[in-house]
Amino acid sequence: MDNFKHLPEPFRIRVIEPVKRTTREYREEAILKAGMNPFLLDSEDVFIDLLTDSGTGAITQDMQAAMFRGDEAYSGSRSYHALANAVKDIFGYEFTIPTHQGRGAEQIYIPVLIKKREIEKGLDRSKMVALSNYFFDTTQGHTQINCCVAKNVYTEEAFDTGVKADFKGNFDLEKLEEAILEAGPANVPYIVSTITCNSAGGQPVSLANLKAVYEIAKRYDIPVIMDSARFAENAYFIQQREKDYQNWSIEEITRESYKYADGLAMSAKKDAMVQMGGLLCFKDESFLDVYTECRTLCVVQEGFPTYGGLEGGAMERLAVGLYDGMRQDWLAYRINQVEYLVNGLESIGVVCQQAGGHAAFVDAGKLLPHIPADQFPAHALACELYKVAGIRAVEIGSLLLGRDPATGKQHPCPAELLRLTIPRATYTQTHMDFIIEAFGKVKANAANVKGLEFTYEPQVLRHFTARLKEIDA
């Protein structure tokens, strides 16, 4: 298939789901009833759902077939061993705990690593700080509910939508080491390498950067956990952009990347393509004590550690999905679909973050400059987009970032972005064209979009369940 300008999707569509078309009047009433929060809309009222790529996409025929091999034994399931063997083969990690999704892994490993640091290094719980290139929202939430500060040490260009760079998801290595020394190495219970970096726009992290982070962490004996939701997309970007790895396969790059962490926590609902599932894995015997403690917590919080809240068929499907998500032609198609959407939006004057792996990120601050950060311009844009076209998207900005738990003040946000997250193998190029056209209509009326204020504000992860109202001028 060489020398073609346009290549179609590398799959055939066998099952379809009808969707409901609605009127503008209907949608205005629906979003008002949902407290001006797209998370609270009923899915049947959404025409194109770009809220998340987490568990919302299609699966492969091999994944579906694998479900029928499920061993539903409570303990020692054959399906667990199939999953653990896949993890060992792909990532090179010896110890595997399945979880119901990524946050299931987070609620287990975070308190265990804090406790370990306290016992072995004398961590002061009043001074502890965890570090990341950028914490995913639930990782930040679990860090904070364990009374630990979550600090992001990203590069200067990460959130500058006017800058193009190969690896905008990288750690700022100088800031990382400064943050370790400022907190005191003993007070840093873990470092999280997030690949790709979702909050920065699905931007990749280079292998050289992952290696350098790990070297710094080892210097201070700090464990590194790889947030692995989009591990395959990150490997694809490394292959395409990092000179030393252009002739490596996705599988080879993945195995090399995971040398530079001690454990991985994964929402398998992204690159592993399953509707439900997660992983918590550790590399080798040096983390056997952590693995053992995490298994104990798993029994209490997720289920017996050889099923972790998943049925046997789901573990079989995940074992296959880890491989299917690494297919070269699949990844090329997926990344190109995002790039097509970003290029189309920018062609009509809608400024976006550089195309990343799983979503287009619109710079809402530039599209709605009249709305200040504390009135959540990206969330206001999400509501307007739904009213105009029935498209559901999600804010990645001040609303998501939340308040400082100690002071109650709003965290300063580096950018106000609206994420248009593309579910896997679900929407076609025609859908992308419709989204671009919808933004043309939104842009034409942008000056009339109103800011928002809370009518109900949860204390943790407020963006999921908050209720808001428009602010009248």
UniProtKB/Swiss-Prot annotation:
It catalyses: L-tryptophan + H2O = indole + pyruvate + NH4(+). Its EC number is 4.1.99.1. Keywords: Lyase, Pyridoxal phosphate, Tryptophan catabolism. It comes from Vibrio vulnificus (strain YJ016). Its cofactor is pyridoxal 5'-phosphate. The lineage of its organism: Bacteria, Pseudomonadati, Pseudomonadota, Gammaproteobacteria, Vibrionales. This is Tryptophanase. The modification N6-(pyridoxal phosphate)lysine is found at K270. Transmembrane segments: none annotated. The gene is tnaA. The keyword Lyase applies.
